Amino acid sequence: MIPAVTDDDPLEDPLDDDVAPGLDDAEPEPEPRDEHDEPSRPATGSRIGGWVARRGSRFGKGVLDRCAPLSAAIGGGLALWLSFPPIGWWFTAFPGLALLGWVLTRTATTKAGGFGYGVLFGLAFYVPLLPWISGLVGAVPWLALAFAESLFCGLFGLGAVVVVRLPGWPLWFATLWVAAEWAKSTFPFGGFPWGASSYGQTNGPLLALARIGGAPLVSFAVALIGFSLTLLTAQIVWWWRHGHKPGVPAPAVMLPGVAIAASLLVTALVWPQVRQSGTGAGDDTAVTVAAVQGNVPRLGLEFNAQRRAVLDNHVKETLRLADDVKAGRAAQPMFVIWPENSSDIDPLLNADASAQITTAAEAIDAPILVGGVVRADGYTPDNPVANNTVIVWEPTDGPGERHDKQIVQPFGEYLPWRGFFKHLSSYADRAGYFVPGTGTGVVHAAGVPIGITTCWEVIFDRAARESVLNGAQVLAVPSNNATFDEAMSAQQLAFGKLRAVEHDRYVVVAGTTGISAVIAPDGHEISRTEWFQPAYLDNQIRLKTDLTPATKWGPIVQAVLVIAGVAVLLIAILHNGRFAPRMLRRRSATTVKR
C-alpha cells in the first residue's frame, strides 16, 4: 500500500528549488549606526557586480535544476510520438508516459509547473506527429494546431500535480489522462481525437482491449502502465540508495505491480477471442469485395482538369479490375468501394460524369460506392453548400442509397466563424462549404449492409459504432489523402485497425492515393497498396453480425473513466485546501524524490 498523508507529516518548505531564482534573496535591513561613523563602503561598481553575480549564480542553478525535468518532458513526448505510425514503436509509449509521470511527481513541481511541463510534453509529441498539415496550408496552422492540442496535455499536467498527494496516484493519473483525451476529442469545434495514445498501439498487444472498451480503455491501459512504471522505478531506486539503513521499509511496489499485471492479464484473456475472429472461422458469410485506388495527377493541372482526371483514373482502374476478373486473374467482387472525392464533379448533375461511372459499374457488373461532392439543400451561388457523400451506383439503375458525411472537418471542409477567421488568414478562403448530413451511417450494396465512415469520421468513436448498431456487417473507410503525405495515411490506417478490433468487423480502406487496405477483425492487414500509385484490392472477407462489448457499452466505459478522473480531481482539490498556497499543504510520501 502507498502511505497516505497524515497530520504528523512535516510541512514542506515552500521556498524550495522550484522558486524562481532571485525571488527569495532580498537584501537585509541595514543596522542602525551613528551618523558620525564613517564606514568604508565598497565602490558602486563592486556592489553592482556582486548583485549580478549572486543573481547569475541563482539563475544558473535554477537552469541546471530544471534541465532534468525539461529534458524528461521533451523526451517523453518524443517517445510517445515514436509509438505512432509511420514508425510504430508501440512500446515506447510506456517509457514516454513514465518520464512525464516522473516530472509531474517531483516535489519541486508546482501546479503551474505541471501545466508548463505538460504543454512542453505535448509540443514534443504533436509537432512531429502533424507536419503533414503544413503541406497544404503552411507551417503556421500546423504549429498552431500542435500548440492547441498541447494545452490539453498541460491541463492533464495541472490536474496530475493536484492529485499526486492521494494514495494510488498512478491510477488517478490514468483516469485524468483519459479525461484529457476525451476533452480534446470534443472541444473545440467537435474536437480532434488525432493523437489519442490508443492509436499508437495498433501493432501491440494492448490493441485487444479495444474489443471490450474501445479506444478509451486502450488509452487507459497505456497510461496506467506508463505511470505505474514511474512509481515502480522511483521506489526501487530510492530503496537501492537507502535500503541499507536500519529501519528503512521495503519499496512500495504492490500497487504498480498489480496495475501492470492486471493490464497484461486482461489483455491475455481477450486476445484469443480477437485472434479467432481474425482467422475467419465460424459460419459467417464469405463475400469478395474490391477497393479501387485510382491515384491523382501530379501538380500542374488546373483545378477542373484535376477533378476530371481523378474521376477518369478511378474509372480506368475499375475497368482494369473488370478485365482481370474476365481473365480469371481476380475474383468477381460483390461490390466495389471508391475513395472519398473520387468524383468531385457532381455525378447527379453532370451527365458526363454519370455516364463514366455507369460504364465502370457495368464493366465490373457490381455496384460501386462512389465518393462524390453534391449540392446540399439551400445551395446558392453566394452560399455554395455541399455534401461530401458516398453514393451506391448500381450497374443498371444508377445512383441509389447514399451516406452524407455527418462529421465534417473544421478549417478544411468548412470554416467555423468564417466572418472572423477570414480576416486573420489568407488560407481561410480555401475552406469549403460542406454541411453535415443525416442518416444511419449504413448503405446497402448487393444486399449487404455497409457502414460508412468517410475519412475524418473514422477517428471519432461514435461514427463506426452508430453504423454497427444500425446493422453494418462490414465497415468502409473512403478517404482522400491526396493533399497530405504518406505519414498521414499511415496514421489514418491505424484508426481503421482499431475500429476493426473494436467492433469485430472487416474494414476496407479506399484512398485516392493510398494507403488502401483490407483489415481483418484482429487488426492485421490482409492486403494493402503502396503510396501514390494506381491499384486495386480484391479480397474475400466475412460478413459479421455479433456485437462486441465495446460496441454495446463503449461510451459507458469512457464515461466511467472520465467521471472517475474528474471526481478524484475534485476530491484532491478539497483535500489540498482548494489550491491553497504550498506552504499550507503537505506532500505525500508517494511523490518521487528528486
Curated annotation (Swiss-Prot):
What do mutants without this gene show? Not essential. Loss of N-acylation of apolipoproteins.
Pathway(s) this gene product operates in, as recorded in its UniProt entry:
Protein modification; lipoprotein biosynthesis (N-acyl transfer)
Q: Topology check: give the Extracellular ranges.
A: 88-116, 161-221, 270-554
E.C. no: 2.3.1.269
An annotated GO cellular component: plasma membrane
List the InterPro entries hit by this protein, alphabetically: Apolipo_AcylTrfase (IPR004563), C-N_Hydrolase (IPR003010), C-N_Hydrolase_sf (IPR036526), LNT_N (IPR045378)
Composition-biased stretches, type Basic and acidic residues, lie in: 30-40
Localization in the cell:
Cell membrane
Positions the record marks as coiled coil are none
Which residue ranges does the record assign to the CN hydrolase domain?
287-543
The family note in this entry says: Belongs to the CN hydrolase family. Apolipoprotein N-acyltransferase subfamily.
Other facts: In a number of other Mycobacteria, including M.bovis and M.tuberculosis, this protein is the second domain in a 2 domain protein.
Protein role: Catalyzes the phospholipid dependent N-acylation of the N-terminal cysteine of apolipoprotein, the last step in lipoprotein maturation. Can transfer a number of fatty acids (C16 and C19, palmitic and probably tuberculostearic acids respectively are shown). Enhances the polyprenol monophosphomannose (PPM) synthase activity of Ppm1 (AC A0QZ12) without itself having PPM synthase catalytic activity.
What is the protein named? Apolipoprotein N-acyltransferase
- Specify the species: Mycolicibacterium smegmatis (strain ATCC 700084 / mc(2)155)
Q: What is the lineage of its organism?
A: Bacteria, Bacillati, Actinomycetota, Actinomycetes, Mycobacteriales
Gene name in the database record: lnt
